[in-house]
Every structure is written in structure tokens, then in C-alpha cells.
């Protein structure tokens, strides 16, 4: 069904197209036609990672359902897990429009959304009543007007509020669209953030009687020394997983596109080699001590196989889902099935 409406979606403004697609999916789900959102029957491929059981290893990355408004509809697609957010302590509108650009010739997207979301309290209200039964990740960040030196307070506030409802929490310190955010990926700022988050997680685990894993999502634009320090701190503080990678500021592979001059993070096919290389390095540095989530530029079954070979335990898609729809999920799962 996605192939029938894709030409229309590609002619629409990118942000309106995403909104229309989600509304259309919601309507099908409400009418009891959610089965139409999935391709053929998907293989049963349960995975045990971070103490959680995933129906299959391919999930939806954060960014598509920022406020947890579409979980039931997206749940029909067949993802092994869904990550909502990024959510911040207070609502914020994000950056001015236009802020989302498709580069179809390159199967790429440039976004400078800026963590537009309704705030963590609105998300929690929805998570309390959701009928979605799969593994749920919540991606948390800081408000734009929060000074970098106080950013940790924003993450702690979000963690405390989403903890009872999240199966895991993803800490977003790598979006290029919030000033100063990437400073949190290294040095004393990273150490303070991870130290305080893991301490609070321990307190909350005792309070609620359940352990919620922490995943940190990193940028593809760090240098080797920064990645080495990051891995040291991940091991030091017992972080449960690393998602590699977020979008890139590089324009490698799209230099000839008129939209390449737009500010923001680049995702999709051009991100593939950079995200693959970072994942391979993390796999070597962390070994099997920390689970890895491969994300960024996964557009085909071959891409999925390459990420798994590099050490990924799980995969996430976003741009590939925008361009290929649910059929991509089917292709990825077939590619990483045990018989392959």
C-alpha cells in the first residue's frame, strides 16, 4: 500500500508529508485495518539484548514519533522496538520552518528540527494509556534555552518522569541542531552527565523494582580521540548500550545537490559509510561488553548484514523507512535471519 501513496508523499512538503503519513496510518489502525501497514508475514526473530526481549532486531529510530502519538499504528508495521522522542523537560517549538528537506536523488534527508516536542509531561500522559505492547525506548534531550552547564538537570528530569513507562532510555547528546549539545559527548561534561544519570537510575530501579537500561546515542563526526574517551566513560559508568550514529554535519556524497547548503544533520544513504566506520570502531573498542545499536544509512539488506557483521546487536531505521516504507523492514529481517 505504501508504494501506492509514495509518489504523492514525495510531491508534498517534507514535514507535511510525514504528518500526513502518520495520520493515514493512525486512521487505518483505528478502523481495524492495521494489518495493511505491514508487508508480508515477518519472520519471528526474538533477540535478548540489555535484559530485554525484542520481537526482532530492527527498530524505528527516534524522530518520527516525537510525542508518542502514533505508537499503536507504528506497532502494526512490525518493528522489533520503537523509540519515541526526542523529548525535553518543557515543550518547545523547535527551529523555524522549513526545517526538513528530502534529497531523493541521494535517498537522503537534511533536518534541523531542533527537538520540537510537546514536553515530557505530555509524552508521559500518552505512555500511561498506550496499548502498544512492544519494547519502547524513550529518547531524552535538553531544552534549547538550558545552558550547557545545566544540561544534566534536563536529562535527570526526563529520566525520572519516563522511567516507569520506558523499557530503555536513550540519551541524545549528538543532535547537531541544539546549540552546545554535542559538547556533552566528551570531557568533564560527559563524565558528569553519565555519573549523575546512572546514580539516579540506581535510585529509580530500587524505587520501582525494575531496571531500565540506558543507551547513549553518539554523533558520527567525533574524532578518534573523542571516541576513545567516550568508550572509556561508557565502560566506567556501566552504560547499557550505544547507538551509532546520529546525523552528520558532513555533506559527503550530496555536494552536487542544491539542498546540500541547508543547515542541519544529514541522514540516509550518504551517512552509510561514516556510520558503518564508527560502528566498526566501537565494536573493536568495546568488544562484546556493551551492546551496540546500528543506525544511520541502513537502506538495504546488505547494509543490515554489514552492521551486524561489525558488531551491532540491534538495528534502527528512519530515512530508509521514509523512502522505502514497511517493505524495507521485511528486507532487513530476511537479510539478517539466521539462515543467512
UniProtKB/Swiss-Prot annotation:
Query: Which amino acids does the record list as binding substrate?
Result: 66, 111-115, 172, 177, 246-247
Reactions it catalyzes: (S)-dihydroorotate + a quinone = orotate + a quinol
Q: What is its main location?
A: membrane
Name the GO terms of the biological process aspect: 'de novo' pyrimidine nucleobase biosynthetic process; 'de novo' UMP biosynthetic process
Q: Which domain of life is it from?
A: Bacteria
**Where in the cell is the protein located?**
Cell membrane
Annotated EC = 1.3.5.2
Cofactor dependence is on: FMN
Q: Which InterPro entries match?
A: Aldolase_TIM (IPR013785), DHO_dehydrogenase (IPR050074), Dihydroorotate_DH_1_2 (IPR012135), Dihydroorotate_DH_2 (IPR005719), Dihydroorotate_DH_cat (IPR005720), Dihydroorotate_DH_CS (IPR001295)
What is its pathway? Pyrimidine metabolism; UMP biosynthesis via de novo pathway; orotate from (S)-dihydroorotate (quinone route): step 1/1
Q: Which residues are FMN-binding?
A: 62-66, 86, 139, 172, 217, 245, 268, 297, 318-319
Give the record's cofactor note, including how many are bound: Binds 1 FMN per subunit.
Q: Which GO terms describe its molecular function?
A: dihydroorotate dehydrogenase (quinone) activity
What topology does the record note for this protein and the membrane?
Peripheral membrane protein
So where's the catalytic machinery, residue-wise? Answer: 175 (nucleophile)
Q: Does the keyword Nucleus apply?
A: no
Q: Name one GO cellular component term.
A: plasma membrane
Q: What class of enzyme is it?
A: oxidoreductase
**Name of a matching Pfam family:** DHO_dh
Sorted keywords for this record are: Cell membrane, Flavoprotein, FMN, Membrane, Oxidoreductase, Pyrimidine biosynthesis
> What PANTHER family does UniProt report for this protein, alphabetically?
DIHYDROOROTATE DEHYDROGENASE (QUINONE), MITOCHONDRIAL, DIHYDROOROTATE DEHYDROGENASE (QUINONE), MITOCHONDRIAL-RELATED
Q: Which family does it belong to?
A: Belongs to the dihydroorotate dehydrogenase family. Type 2 subfamily.
Free-text function comment from the UniProt entry? Catalyzes the conversion of dihydroorotate to orotate with quinone as electron acceptor.
Q: Quaternary structure?
A: Monomer.
The name this protein carries in UniProt is Dihydroorotate dehydrogenase (quinone)
Q: Which organism is it from?
A: Alkalilimnicola ehrlichii (strain ATCC BAA-1101 / DSM 17681 / MLHE-1)
The taxonomy runs: Bacteria, Pseudomonadati, Pseudomonadota, Gammaproteobacteria, Chromatiales
Amino acid at each position: 500500500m505504501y508504494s501506492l501513496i509514495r509518489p504523492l508523499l514525495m510531491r508534498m512538503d517534507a514535514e507535511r508529508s510525514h504528518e500526513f503519513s502518520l495520520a493515514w496510518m493512525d486512521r487505518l489502525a483505528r478502523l481495524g485495518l492495521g494489518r495493511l501497514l505491514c508487508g508480508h508475514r515477518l519472520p519471528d526473530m526474538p533477540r535478548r539484548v540489555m535484559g530485554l526481549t525484542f520481537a526482532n532486531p530492527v527498530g524505528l529510530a527516534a524522530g518520527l514519533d516525537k510525542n508518542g502519538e502514533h505508537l499503536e499504528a507504528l506497532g502494526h508495521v512490525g518493528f522489533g522496538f520503537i523509540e519515541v522522542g526526542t523529548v525535553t523537560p518543557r515543550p518547545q517549538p523547535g527551529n523555524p520552518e522549513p526545517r526538513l528537506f528530502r534529497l531523493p536523488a541521494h535517498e537522503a534527508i537534511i533536518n534541523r528540527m531542533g527537538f520540537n516536542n510537546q514536553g515530557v509531561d505530555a509524552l508521559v500522559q500518552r505512555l500511561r494509556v498506550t496499548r502498544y505492547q512492544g519494547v519502547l525506548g524513550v529518547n531524552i534531550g535538553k531544552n534549547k534555552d538550558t545552558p550547557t552547564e545545566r544540561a544534566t538537570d534536563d536529562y535527570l528530569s526526563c529520566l525520572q518522569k519516563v522511567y516507569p513507562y520506558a523499557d530503555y532510555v536513550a540519551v541524545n547528546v549528538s543532535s547537531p541542531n541544539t546549540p552546545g549539545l554535542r559538547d556533552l559527548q566528551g570531557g568533564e561534561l560527559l563524565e558528569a552527565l553519565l555519573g549523575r544519570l546512572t546514580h539516579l537510575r540506581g535510585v529509580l530501579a530500587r524505587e520501582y523494582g525494575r531496571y531500565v537500561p540506558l543507551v547513549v546515542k553518539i554523533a558520527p563526526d567525533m574524532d578518534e580521540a573523542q571516541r576513545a574517551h567516550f568508550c572509556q566513560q561508557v565502560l566506567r559508568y556501566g552504560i547499557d548500550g550505544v547507538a551509532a550514529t546520529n546525523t552528520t554535519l558532513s555533506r559527503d556524497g550530496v555536494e552536487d545537490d542544491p539542498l546540500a547548503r541547508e543547515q542541519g544533520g544529514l541522514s540516509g544513504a550518504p551517512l552509510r559509510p561514516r556510520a558503518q566506520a564508527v560502528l566498526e570502531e566501537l565494536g573493536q573498542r568495546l568488544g562484546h561488553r556493551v551492546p551496540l545499536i546500528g543506525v544511520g544509512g541502513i537502506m538495504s539488506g546488505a547494509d543490515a548484514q554489514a552492521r551486524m557483521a561489525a558488531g551491532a546487536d540491534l538495528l534502527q531505521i528512519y530515512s530508509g523507512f521514509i523512502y522505502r516504507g514497511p517493505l524495507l523492514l521485511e528486507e532487513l529481517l530476511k537479510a539478517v535471519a539466521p539462515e543467512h
